[in-house]
Every structure is written in C-alpha cells, then in structure tokens.
Curated annotation (Swiss-Prot):
Maximin-4 shows antibacterial activity against both Gram-positive and Gram-negative bacteria. It also shows antimicrobial activity against the fungus C.albicans, but not against A.flavus nor P.uticale. It has little hemolytic activity. It does not possess a significant cytotoxicity against tumor cell lines. It does not possess a significant anti-HIV activity. Maximin-H3 shows antibacterial activity against both Gram-positive and Gram-negative bacteria. It also shows antimicrobial activity against the fungus C.albicans. Shows strong hemolytic activity. Keywords: Amidation, Amphibian defense peptide, Antibiotic, Antimicrobial, Cleavage on pair of basic residues, Cytolysis, Fungicide, Hemolysis, Secreted, Signal. It holds the Pfam family Bombinin. This is Maximins 4/H3 type 2. It is found in: Secreted. Residues 1-18 form the signal peptide. The modification Asparagine amide is found at residue 70. Expressed by the skin glands. GO terms for biological process: defense response to bacterium; defense response to fungus; killing of cells of another organism. The modification Isoleucine amide is found at residue 143. InterPro entries: Bombinin. Residues 19-43, 74-123 form a propeptide. Belongs to the bombinin family.
C-alpha cells in the first residue's frame, strides 16, 4: 500500500511540475505576442507621425516655393528656390525610397550605399530646418 501511495504522489508531483512548466512557456509566448503587438502599435504611431511631419514639410516647402516663384527673385532668392526644389526632391524620395535608392545607388558598393544614406539623412534634416528658418525669417522681415 505504501508503495502505491508513493507512486501516486510521485506521479501527482511530476504532473503538477509539468503543468507549471507548460504554463510558464505559455505565459512567455503570450508575453512575446503582447510585446510584438505593442511594438507594432508603436511603429504604426511612429509611421503616422512621420507621414504627418513629411506632409507638413512638403506643404511648407510648396508654399515657400510658390512664394518665391511668383515674385521677382534676387540671386539670394534664386538660391533659396534651388534649395527648396532639392528639399522637395529629397522629401519625394522619402515617399518612394525603393525608386530613389535604385536611381542613386547604381554602381556603388555596399559601404558607399550605407554612407550615401547616412549623408542623405543629414542632407535632408539640416537644410530643411535651415531653409524653413531662413524663409520664415525672410517673410517676417518683408511683412514687418
């Protein structure tokens, strides 16, 4: 009788241990799924914010380009217009990165491609902020 009791208790302990391990594995996989879902949500929100920022920059660049295109331009205004056109091309290439990267990277090796994209990011953000500041400063001077 004692032997049957020992076997039954051992079986009960082993099955309880197995169930606990199974639940731990399930909770880990559920946690991974939840983390992945939250990462997708964060990426979605980031994508929406990036799209809104790009749209705002494009709109501002178009307004500034129209302003400079309709009036008489000095050499400085002409230079600003050229920069705005370059910014517009860069912003358009952000909307269609595959096409832009195919055009820009033909004949480059992988290291040059990585350097090109790093330079492109710097080339877009720096001048955009500078141009927006200069254009707004120029508009304020002309209005005031």
């Amino acid at each position: 009788m004692n032997f049957k009791y020992i076997i039954a208790v051992s079986f009960f302990i082993a099955s309880a241990y197995a169930r606990r391990n199974e639940k731990d594995v399930q909770s880990l996989s559920q946690r991974d799924v939840l983390e992945e879902e939250s990462l997708r949500e964060i990426r979605g929100i980031g994508g929406v914010l990036l799209s809104a920022g790009k749209a705002a920059l494009k709109g501002l660049a178009k307004v500034l380009a129209e302003k400079y295109a309709n009036g008489k331009r000095t050499a400085e205004d002409h230079e600003v217009m050229k920069r705005l056109e370059a910014v517009m091309r860069d912003l358009d290439s952000l909307d269609h990165p595959e096409e832009a990267s195919e055009r820009e990277t033909r004949g480059f090796n992988q290291e040059e491609i990585a350097n090109l994209f790093t330079k492109k990011e710097k080339r877009i953000l720096g001048p955009v902020l500078g141009l927006v500041g200069n254009a707004l400063g120029g508009l304020i001077k002309k209005i005031g």
